[in-house]
A protein has these predicted regions:
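Short terminal hydrophobic/aromatic SLiMs and anchors at protein ends
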Residues: 2-3, 10
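N-terminal ligand-binding lobe of clamshell/alpha-beta domains
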Residues: 12-277
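Compositionally biased, low-complexity segments enriched in small residues
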Residues: 6-7, 23
Length: 277
């Protein structure tokens, strides 16, 4: 019997690996449906991609591998009936990305759920370790080891001064990231100081408030809002150190929000962008 401790907390009232009692599977799952793009990529990196029988339409990585995997809708609007048709013995979900109603419906149908709720890089690492254990991943160390080494290196580095950093995740209105989000911790671990850190969740901020924050670095991700070169002028027009010092950067949103095999490279790239001259 495979018995890896997932924990039961108040997140959706479902099995959550990070806060409560036990959860067990009789054997390693053979038919996995992943509702989380970054964890779909992780499952393939772990060496169990052949067991992934379902994915969302946003699960596009690795592109050469996922093409033949059945789609079950989006991350927020999962086709529960289609998932059940695939007869999974494990569904992989994350609180931040998947709708409570979909996860509850699958649980009510008797489907084992792995539900992660990472709010920090350390949480994400623990989640990956638990998932790797449950699926008996043959390449777990090859994926997780490099992330742990980069993470510990950044924790020990302790920059002399952390640049004030603004990361909008939406426009119209602008929305930043609060202290209880995964992106906040990614910024902090990478050496920045999140200017919206006094807030929670995703605070709405005006251009005037952005100027008051006086960010020294602005990172414009291409997801969830697709910031592009057309948005740069609006930020360079602000009276902020990031504009004066030419430190407004368009970045791949996956650097900030994806868990899994790309985390080591993401943390390295972000720490380089947040290193002031």
């Amino acid at each position: 019997m495979v018995t890896h401790a997932l924990r039961v907390g108040n997140t959706f009232g479902l099995a959550v690996f990070r806060a409560g009692a036990g959860y067990a599977l009789r054997m390693a799952p053979r038919r996995i449906v992943s509702l989380v793009p970054s964890l779909t990529e992780a499952l393939f990196a772990f060496g169990v991609g052949e067991r992934v029988v379902g994915r969302t339409r946003y699960c596009t990585q690795p592109p050469r591998c996922v093409g033949g995997v059945e789609k079950v809708g989006g991350t927020k609007k999962v086709d529960v009936g289609r998932v059940l048709d695939l007869e999974p013995d494990l569904v992989v979900a994350v609180r931040e990305e998947n709708a409570r109603e979909s996860v509850e419906a699958l649980r009510a149908a008797g489907v084992p759920i792995f539900l992660g709720a990472p709010e920090t890089v350390a949480d994400a690492l623990e989640m990956l370790e638990k998932l790797a254990g449950i699926v008996e991943a043959p390449r777990a160390e090859a994926v997780i080891g490099p992330i742990e080494r980069v993470y510990e290196g950044l924790r020990r580095a302790r920059p002399v001064r952390r640049p004030r950093t603004f990361v909008p995740i939406w426009k119209g209105p602008y929305m930043g990231v609060g202290s209880d989000t995964y992106v906040h911790d990614v910024i902090e671990v990478s050496g920045g100081e999140n200017v919206c850190g006094a807030h929670t969740r995703y605070p709405i901020v005006s251009p005037e408030e952005i100027e008051a924050f006086q960010p020294e670095v602005v990172l414009l991700p291409d997801e969830p809002y697709p910031f592009s070169a057309e948005d740069l002028a609006e930020f360079y027009a602000l009276d902020i150190p990031a504009a004066h010092g030419d430190r407004i950067h368009l970045v791949d949103g996956k650097l900030l929000t994806w868990y899994g095999p790309r985390m080591a490279g993401s943390l390295r790239q972000l720490s380089a962008l947040l290193r002031l001259p």
